[in-house]
């Protein structure tokens, strides 16, 4: 068969079927273009996560902010401060001035190098000096040894540009609060949706609006579901406790508060037992404080004592359990469900975020009238809190905070009950 014959045969074939061939080529090109743009979305890991709470772009949950960026410092599992954006720091004057040197090899997620001019924590009680592109100085009004802990909060440039692997793709706000936030990393996309209550969050999951619930305390709605996985973790950075109004005439006596603590059976409470104000993971934690295990011999003087126990709605079951324990020893207890701490309360049941540093000046010092919920005024505890926040040596600070916990628990401005259980629920 001659080459000329083969050429004419091919020419005749194309002439007869050219329309079909061109359509096939066109469809093939469209197919490969579609694969290029669509396949990543098919194969990528996409999650839609629901979270309860009101958050702003400046105050996001750690679950999100730590994916997007980091601070000058960060905190390890033991609660110790370690370098992050800053590679080193020092205080030349015992905690009033802090100088940080940033890592010159780090970049923002937009590819630009990080300089000290980009760092803006917007502190109202500190001035900032930019020494050079790699050195920044903070001038405080008074010495504060825990200042590097404050700088563990992730920082961002304008547009929520951070230093993490994830980037913000879209953000939706309502009245300044986050409604929806989409972040991406290579082929992964995570959509966060925010809800005002656990009930709204659970409904969204049931309706398929989200495929993962982040940290709720009551997963019972889904215990019988075969299509979900439920993961439990202990919230060691929180405690549930009863705060006593130490200015109330019925509760101003330390002995009464101690006896009320002894009246509660703590072994059958949810979560993991808490005995003090610090996380057991903290380097300053004191495991040797008085535990106030139930002791009915200490409760004889409580008969006919009247107490109103105010509680947030999510802790109502715990409040009812405490009411039962108290009534068993003759206490007349009434439960009041509230959305916030009442101005003139007697006992208030709440979940508290434990500060990342052992410094709890704002929670217990007598001068902190807006945050000292129990209205505690104890000179010895005040002095320990004052000493702890100006001492730079960690071992010396630890001794101070061991004493602080011992005296605070003895004073019983609050009964420390448990570290709560949190549940994350996701579809299989």
Give names to the regions the model predicted:
Residues 259-288, 317-321, 343-428:
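Detector for C-terminal structural segments
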Residues 76, 133, 139-192, 196-199:
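Gly/Pro-rich hinge or "lid" segments in bacterial periplasmic/extracellular proteins
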Residues 23-24, 299-354:
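Ligand/substrate-recognition segments at binding pockets and active sites
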Residues 47-93:
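N-terminal lobe/hinge region of extracytoplasmic solute-binding protein
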Residues 18-36:
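Hydrophobic membrane-insertion alpha-helices, especially the h-region
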Residues 182, 194, 227-259, 263, ...:
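A bilobed periplasmic-binding-protein/Venus flytrap-type ligand-binding module shared by bacterial periplasmic
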Residues 88-127, 204:
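Aromatic- and charge-enriched surface segment that lines or borders ligand/interaction sites
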Residues 171-179, 191-247, 351-352:
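Extracellular/periplasmic solute-recognition and catalytic clefts
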């Amino acid at each position: 068969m001659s080459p000329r014959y083969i050429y004419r045969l091919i020419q005749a074939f194309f002439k007869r079927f050219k329309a079909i061939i061109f359509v096939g080529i066109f469809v093939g090109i469209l197919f490969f273009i579609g694969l290029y743009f669509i396949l990543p979305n098919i194969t990528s890991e996409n999650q839609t996560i629901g979270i309860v709470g009101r958050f702003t772009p400046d105050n996001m949950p750690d679950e999100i902010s730590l994916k997007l960026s980091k601070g000058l410092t960060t905190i390890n599992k033991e609660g110790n401060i370690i370098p992050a954006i800053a590679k080193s720091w020092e205080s030349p004057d015992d905690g009033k001035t802090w100088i940080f040197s940033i890592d010159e090899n780090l970049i923002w997620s937009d590819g630009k190098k990080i300089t000290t001019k980009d760092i803006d924590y917007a502190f109202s009680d500190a001035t900032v000096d930019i020494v050079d592109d790699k050195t920044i100085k903070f001038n405080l009004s008074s010495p504060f040894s825990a200042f590097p802990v404050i700088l563990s909060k992730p920082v961002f440039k304008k547009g929520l540009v951070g230093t993490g692997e994830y980037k913000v793709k879209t953000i939706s706000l309502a009245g300044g609060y986050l409604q929806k936030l989409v972040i991406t990393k290579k082929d992964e996309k995570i959509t966060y949706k925010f809800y005002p209550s656990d009930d709204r969050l659970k409904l969204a999951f049931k309706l398929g609006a989200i495929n993962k619930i982040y940290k709720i305390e009551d997963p019972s709605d889904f215990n019988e579901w075969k299509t979900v996985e439920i993961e439990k973790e202990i919230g060691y950075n929180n405690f549930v406790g009863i705060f006593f109004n130490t200015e109330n005439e019925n509760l101003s006596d330390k002995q009464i508060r101690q006896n009320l603590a002894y009246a509660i059976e703590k072994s059958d409470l949810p979560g993991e037992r808490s005995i003090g104000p610090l996380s057991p993971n903290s380097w300053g934690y004191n495991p040797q404080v008085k535990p106030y295990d139930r002791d009915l011999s200490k409760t004889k003087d409580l008969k006919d004592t009247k107490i109103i126990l105010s509680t947030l709605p999510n802790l109502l079951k715990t409040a009812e359990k405490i009411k039962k324990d108290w009534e068993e020893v003759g206490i007349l207890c009434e439960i009041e469900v509230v959305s916030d701490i009442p101005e003139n309360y007697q006992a208030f049941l709440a979940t508290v975020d434990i500060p990342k540093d052992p410094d709890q000046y704002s929670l217990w010092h007598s001068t902190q009238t807006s945050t000292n919920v129990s209205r505690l005024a104890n000179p010895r505890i005040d002095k320990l809190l004052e000493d702890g926040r100006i001492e730079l040596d960690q071992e010396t600070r630890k001794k101070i905070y061991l004493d602080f916990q011992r005296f605070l628990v003895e004073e019983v401005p609050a009964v420390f009950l448990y570290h709560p259980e949190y549940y994350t629920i996701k579809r299989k």
